[in-house]
Each structure stands twice: as C-alpha cells, then as structure tokens.
Amino acid sequence: MPVLILFLFISLLMPNAATYADTDKLVIAHRGASGYLPEHTIAAKAMAYAMGADYIEQDLVMTKDDRLVVLHDHYLDRISNVMSEFPERYREVNGKKRWFAIDFTLAEIQGLRVSEGFSVDDAEIGGGKAAFKANYPTRFPLFKSRFSVHTFEEEIELIQGLNKSTGEDIGLYPEIKAPWFHRHEGKDISKEVLRVLKKYGYTTKNDLVYLQCFDPNETER
C-alpha cells in the first residue's frame, strides 16, 4: 500500500505525464553522478547534468537553523568528518552513535569535509582516530579533493543556471527525507520544501519536478 500511495503521489505531480509514450525513457540521476564523485555534491550534480540526465535527485533534510540541505541520510557521519570535528555532539540511537544534521547549523555543516560514503566500527568512533572503510572501494577515494554539503537553493540555482547557459531543460527530483523525525523535532520539512520550490517557480503540474516521499502519512497531507 505505501508503494502504491507513493506512485500515485508522484504520478499526480509528474509534468506532462500523459505525453510520454510507452517507449520513452527518463534518466534520473540518483544522488547525482554518484558512481563517479561523492554523492549529492555539487560536483556530482554538475557531472550528472553533463552526462545528459533528464532529472537530478535531491534528498532533503533540515538543519538546526531550518535550512534545507542535500543529504541522503538525516545524519552526517556516513559521508563527512563530523565525528572528528564535533566528537561529542552525537545522539545514541539503539546503541549506535549518530551525528544528526538537525543538531548542526548550516554554517557548521558547510564547514565539514564531505567524502565518498564509508563505514566505521562503532568501537573506534571518537577523536578522529576511527579507521574508515569505503562502502564502494572502486569509487572516488575517501576524503580526497574538497567537497562540502550544499543547500537545496544552491542546487536549484545550479540546475537553472545550466539550463539557461546550455539551452537544456533538466528537472528536479526532490525527496522529503524522514518527515516523521523532523516533526518530532518541531520542524515541518514538507512545508519548507514546498516554499522553496514555489520561490524558484515550481508551482504547477507542467513544471519539471517530481516530488517524492516514502512516508504515506506525509503524502496524504
């Protein structure tokens, strides 16, 4: 049932859905060009655009100061150096330490270094001494070059700017992440996502945007 609700929700929002033939295909860049560059970085999104994606995905979570940032998880410890920069600012959830984006300001988050995804033994976490293990060893090396977290607004401006300079018309594919968690923390992430989309002109079914959420209660709002 949740999958059906999600499908219906996306179908209603899909631009010009009835105009696509059965043989048409859409290329949706999942987390950007995440097989080549660290996921959800501006570099990964620019590369996905250059590779010819029709839509580019944005997973969205909120910061302590109510900004939308592009992250697959609502925590930071899988893709950044947050553990060494803020070793004490974690929450323990089911016996596991997690550094949640909602506990940091945008400025603090954008000061972190972003990497290809990794895992770490929980017993080794603390003081920046943990041994990171790449989740996908053949992808971009861990903590090489310089990448950071960016806002939803920054990514929209990148895509709209490239649309203008290239003459293409590439769409957005935002996902509202963990709305239940944000509500528990007193934040209405869905309302903020809709506000930002409206700010940048995405207001009708004909606009090039999919809006997705895997929480059926949230889609019914």
Where are these regions (language model features)?
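Bacterial N-terminal signal peptides
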Residues: V3-P15
